[in-house]
Amino acid sequence: MQGPHAQMTDAAYEIRRSEIAALSTDLAPEDPIPVVEYTEWEHEVWRTVCVDLTARHRTDAAAEYLESAEQLAVPLDHVPQLRDVSGRLGSISGFTFQSAPALVPLREFCGGLANSVFHSTQYLRHPRSPFYTEDPDLLHDLVGHGNVLASDRFARLYRLAGNAAARVHSTEALQFIGKVFWFTLECGVVRERGERKAYGATLVSSYGELDHFRSADFRPLDIKSLADVEYDISTYQPILFEADSMDEVEDTVGSFWDTCDDDSIAALLGGTSRSVTPH
């Protein structure tokens, strides 16, 4: 991103990010989402990324993502207030947002999903790197997750992931549920008319990921195969799993989350512990 805001120092950015995070540090679930007075550089980052992503989505995003995004109609020309988007999303699919100061622990995050609540940050990525961030930010949470949560199918899948996490007790089982979430709802790809299209939130909210994802090593979507693949959120994904249709995603992933428990996941993992870093 060119312009004066691209020269913002790391120290100034961290101060601003901390200011926004502090607004939600002590919020109770029933408290209203804070209103953030966004600065011009934040609006500039939002506009720059959204304009470029919208163009890329026409060729690279799955049809169901595009339809859902059109329904939610997140503004492209300014940073929206999270509480406004939350209200609109709630009227569409029943999901709402809860403001979070940063990435929340996986069990807490999934607990929200079970109750149709998505924890979202309210700060934006550094203006020096607007097209990719390894940390979740408002762009990732709204353009990536918010847009698909306006789809009834995706809203069901997110709830199923949350309910699955609530059923399990072992760390290994919880982490594996998180891994399935990562390779589908974060980094999922589907074939449409012979072309690979992205539907995962990490892919559709990152120009860099959309540039890179078709060069990945693609494997058929299979829950057992996921157990043997690790991931690193700090880089573009070298391995992705693709489905032949969104119905296959719903059948494969939805059925797993709907029925899994500690024992079935332990059997799937072969009794061994595999450590992953949840996003």
Curated annotation (Swiss-Prot):
Keywords: Iron, Metal-binding, Monooxygenase, Oxidoreductase, Phenylalanine catabolism
Sites where the protein binds Fe cation: H140, H145, E186
Single GO term (MF): iron ion binding
Record has Nuclease as a keyword: no
Cofactors demanded by this protein: Fe(2+)
Consequence recorded when altering C187F: Loss of hydroxylase activity. Only a small amount of 3-hydroxy-L-phenylalanine (meta-Tyr) is formed
Pfam families: Biopterin_H
Positions marked as site (Important for the regiospecific hydroxylation of the phenyl ring): C187, T202
PROSITE patterns cross-referenced by the UniProt entry: BH4_AAA_HYDROXYL_2
EC primary class: oxidoreductase
pH profile of the protein: Optimum pH is 6, and the enzyme tends to precipitate gradually below pH 6.5.
Record keyword Oxidoreductase present: yes
Substrates-to-products reaction catalysed: (6R)-L-erythro-5,6,7,8-tetrahydrobiopterin + L-phenylalanine + O2 = 3-hydroxy-L-phenylalanine + (4aS,6R)-4a-hydroxy-L-erythro-5,6,7,8-tetrahydrobiopterin
Gene Ontology biological process terms in this record: L-phenylalanine catabolic process
SUPFAM superfamilies xref list: Aromatic aminoacid monoxygenases, catalytic and oligomerization domains (SSF56534)
E.C. numbers: 1.14.16.7
Recorded family membership: Belongs to the biopterin-dependent aromatic amino acid hydroxylase family.
General function of this protein: Tetrahydrobiopterin (BH4) seems to be the physiological pterin, however the hydroxylase is also able to use 6-methyltetrahydropterin (6-MePH4).
This protein's name: Phenylalanine 3-hydroxylase
Organism: Streptomyces coeruleorubidus
Phylogenetic lineage: Bacteria, Bacillati, Actinomycetota, Actinomycetes, Kitasatosporales
Gene: pacX
